[in-house]
């Protein structure tokens, strides 16, 4: 179905750019509309787990992604004193599925994908506001009034997707009950280069993730009402919140300017099973926004992109291609939405006794074996 097909993509994030790479490899014409005026190295870190790296391998970009990031060999969940509660056999899992886990700055990953997509296929400063799909064709409308015609619209425009809003009449995103802070700093002392950790305390968590080039990405969560606002000095507030927690947590916060600390309330949406309507389809966070607790949000967007491009290449008719994409992807992606939500609720327990029980159970369940579910999560087959 390559001949004459033009795909319009709303959103130039990881999912939209990966779809652009996949379509370019497949010889399918496309145009990406990104609301930002430039693709800058903004944001924080992201985990490309083995399943995403296997998906990238089908596009021939896994080596470039790995070179721009940091390969991870292991990880653990700790308590606020720094004692290990549960270990994660990352290197064993990577060996079993045949691909590494790579952590990387979002901006560097974006650069790798952008270089392949090319500037000619990217329209910047272009916010998609809506579309019309009628007898005269499919037209995408931008906020500045411009219109573009194509054969398929892919909504890869995130949690608050304009494409999804037009397809579905539904409530606002679901608040998880906790907020987050994220930062990137150059501190490497006390941070293992190939090891990630997440420390769990009552109602709070703190993650430490090396992302290459001497940088460390960190994130923090705290149970809080939706819509809270930080004190102007976010760094001081976080140092107070995590006072007494083990190194290098205080050092990471201390070495990140308040202006570089991003606060975001954590949301997802109740999973849905219909991502397709006419000549419009959803991808990534627009289709299945999830909390970040399994590190799979970006990974699932990458999987979506590879599968959608493959379906468009293999099927003779557009409706059949979109139906196949939805059938392949919905259940797997929605499983991650549900699993991530459950982990977040457990991770944010505040009751002291409940946290004590949680720690005891996690110690008992910790294993250096790769269980069947983890193995399944980290595998990827395009179709």
UniProtKB/Swiss-Prot annotation:
Keywords: FAD, Flavoprotein, Monooxygenase, NAD, NADP, Oxidoreductase
Catalytic activities: aurachin C + NADH + O2 + H(+) = 4-hydroxy-2-methyl-3-oxo-4-[(2E,6E)-farnesyl]-3,4-dihydroquinoline 1-oxide + NAD(+) + H2O; aurachin C + NADPH + O2 + H(+) = 4-hydroxy-2-methyl-3-oxo-4-[(2E,6E)-farnesyl]-3,4-dihydroquinoline 1-oxide + NADP(+) + H2O; aurachin C + NADH + O2 + H(+) = aurachin C epoxide + NAD(+) + H2O; aurachin C + NADPH + O2 + H(+) = aurachin C epoxide + NADP(+) + H2O
Cofactor: FAD
E.C. code: 1.14.13.222
Gene3D superfamilies from the UniProt entry: FAD/NAD(P)-binding domain
An MF annotation (GO) of this entry: monooxygenase activity
Known role: Catalyzes the initial step in the conversion of aurachin C to aurachin B. Catalyzes the epoxidation of the C(2)-C(3) double bond of aurachin C, which is followed by a semipinacol rearrangement, causing migration of the farnesyl group from C(3) to C(4). Accepts both NADH and NADPH, but has a preference for NADH.
Name recorded for this polypeptide: Aurachin C monooxygenase/isomerase
Gene behind the chain: auaG
């Amino acid at each position: 179905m390559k001949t004459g097909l033009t795909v319009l993509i709303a959103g130039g994030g990881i999912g939209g750019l990966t779809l652009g790479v996949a379509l370019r490899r497949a010889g399918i014409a496309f145009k990406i509309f990104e609301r930002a005026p430039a693709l800058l190295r903004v944001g924080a870190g992201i985990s490309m787990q083995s399943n995403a790296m296997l998906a990238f391998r089908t596009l021939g970009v896994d080596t470039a992604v790995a070179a721009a990031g940091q390969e991870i060999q292991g990880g653990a969940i700790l308590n606020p004193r720094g004692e290990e509660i549960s270990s994660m056999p990352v290197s064993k899992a990577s060996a079993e599925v045949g691909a590494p886990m790579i952590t990387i700055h979002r901006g560097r990953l974006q650069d790798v994908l952008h270089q392949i997509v090319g500037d000619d296929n990217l329209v910047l400063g272009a916010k998609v506001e809506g579309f019309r799909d009628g007898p005269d064709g499919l037209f995408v409308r931008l906020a500045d009034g411009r219109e573009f015609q194509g054969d398929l619209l892919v909504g890869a425009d995130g949690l608050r997707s304009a494409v999804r809003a037009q397809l579905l009449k539904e409530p606002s995103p679901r608040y998880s009950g906790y907020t987050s802070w994220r930062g990137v700093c150059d501190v490497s002392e006390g941070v293992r280069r190939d090891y990630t950790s997440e420390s769990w305390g009552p109602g709070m968590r703190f993650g430490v993730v090396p992302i290459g080039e001497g940088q460390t990405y960190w994130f923090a969560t705290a149970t809080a009402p939706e819509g809270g606002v930080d004190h102007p000095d976010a760094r001081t507030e976080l140092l107070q919140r995590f006072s007494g927690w083990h190194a290098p947590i205080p050092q990471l916060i201390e070495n990140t300017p308040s202006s570089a600390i991003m606060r975001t309330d954590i949301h997802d949406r109740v999973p849905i099973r219909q991502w397709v309507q006419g000549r419009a389809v959803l991808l990534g966070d627009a289709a299945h926004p999830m909390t970040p607790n399994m590190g799979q949000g970006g990974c699932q967007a990458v999987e979506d992109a590879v599968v959608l491009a493959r379906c468009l290449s293999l099927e003779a008719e557009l409706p059949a291609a979109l139906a196949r994409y939805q059938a392949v992807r919905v259940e797997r992606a929605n499983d991650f939405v549900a699993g991530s939500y459950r982990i977040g609720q457990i991770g944010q327990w505040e009751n002291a006794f409940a946290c004590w029980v949680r720690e005891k159970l996690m110690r008992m369940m910790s294993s250096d074996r790769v269980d069947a579910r983890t193995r399944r999560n980290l595998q990827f087959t395009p179709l």
